[in-house]
Design a protein with these regions (language model features):
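Short Pro-Cys-Gly-centered "Cys-loop" motif that presents a nucleophilic cysteine in a tight turn
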Residues: 1-53, 57-58, 66-311
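Conserved G/P- and acidic residue-centered "switch" motifs that form tight phosphate/ATP-binding loops
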Residues: 62
Length: 311
């Protein structure tokens, strides 16, 4: 039976579920969960999507993701592929790790969004020792919602959902806690099961339109780095590597380009090289002070991106 086409929207909010094949746990150790979240953060820096809630269990994980104009399939396929490669290398195994495609369901109402977050945060209730205290589970965003811990992943935007409870942080946390602790019932679980529904969340949120001309990216990178544009086409040079890495990162983010598209722009490089350059670009904006504000500066210089929530 052919697979149904995934329902997607450039301004969609999604319930994403990942799951491993039956015989293999998705996360064998706690370090695996940490690694997955770190790798998701790397992809977040590339694509600028938002994560509103998450919970990682031993064989599956749940997320609420706002694509913010990016292609959710590109994000999840790339992320899961990278995690599977790393997992197989560490545990000396071959073959598939994830069960089929990731599952996604578009969120259609504010009520559904709120109840979905509570459902996700209640997942640890099935684990011995957490039956009455899901907030103590380390690999869930509930602890951040309730103010018990800071978000150490850098992934989370809990404020988007919490604002529906109160503008006052303390009141919002108290009201959200009450919701989580009263909504662990079978009716809610049935409501939130994945079905073949074509639903869509629409709001006043503005999203990034990712259709920039790649030449505009190259000019911006050259201006900000002070490195001549000719270096985009030179091989085996330190400056060339820097500008190519930053350009690859921004083209993936703001042009919605894949590795093949970027190869055509930069010329005479392999897709695997582009993938490595993108990783270098993420490292540069994460660790080098002179590049840390590069993406925000690009946004501030282009009025159609300004105030669209890219962080």
């Amino acid at each position: 039976m052919p697979r149904t086409k995934r329902q997607k929207s450039e301004d969609g909010i999604y319930h994403i579920m990942i799951k491993s094949i039956t015989e293999v746990p998705l996360f064998k150790k706690h370090e695996d969960k940490i690694r997955y979240l770190k790798q998701m953060r790397e992809y977040q820096k590339i694509y600028g999507f938002k994560v509103y809630a998450y919970c990682l269990m031993s064989n599956h994980g749940h997320f609420i993701i706002d694509s913010n104009g990016a292609d959710i399939s590109k994000i999840m396929h790339g992320l899961n592929f990278k995690y599977a490669i790393t997992f197989n290398r560490i545990y000396k195994r071959n073959g598939h790790l994830f069960q089929d495609r990731f599952k996604s369901k578009m969120v259609d109402t504010q009520r559904y969004l709120i109840m979905l977050s509570a459902y996700i945060h209640n997942n640890p209730l099935d684990i011995r020792g957490y039956e009455k205290c899901p907030e103590k589970y380390k690999y869930s965003s509930l602890k951040v919602y309730l103010g018990l811990e800071r978000d150490n992943t850098g992934l989370l935007d809990e404020g988007f959902i919490m604002q529906f409870f109160s503008n006052n942080v303390k009141e919002a946390r108290e009201r959200y806690a009450k919701l989580v602790y009263i909504c662990d019932d079978e009716k809610m679980k049935r409501e939130l099961e994945f079905k073949d529904e074509k639903t869509e969340y629409r709001s006043e949120r503005k999203v990034i339109i990712r259709n920039f001309d790649p030449q505009e990216i190259l000019k911006f990178i050259s201006k900000e780095t002070g490195i001549n544009e000719i270096m985009f086409y030179i091989r085996n040079n330190k400056n060339s590597k820097i500008v190519k890495a930053l350009a690859s990162l921004l083209m993936r983010s703001f042009c919605n380009y894949n590795c093949k598209d970027i190869c055509k722009v930069l010329g005479n490089i392999a897709q695997s090289t582009v993938s490595r350059l993108c990783s270098i670009g993420v490292e540069l904006i994460s660790t080098e002070d002179k590049y840390k504000n590069l993406i925000n500066k690009f946004i501030s210089e282009h009025s159609n991106l300004k105030a669209m929530g890219y962080t």
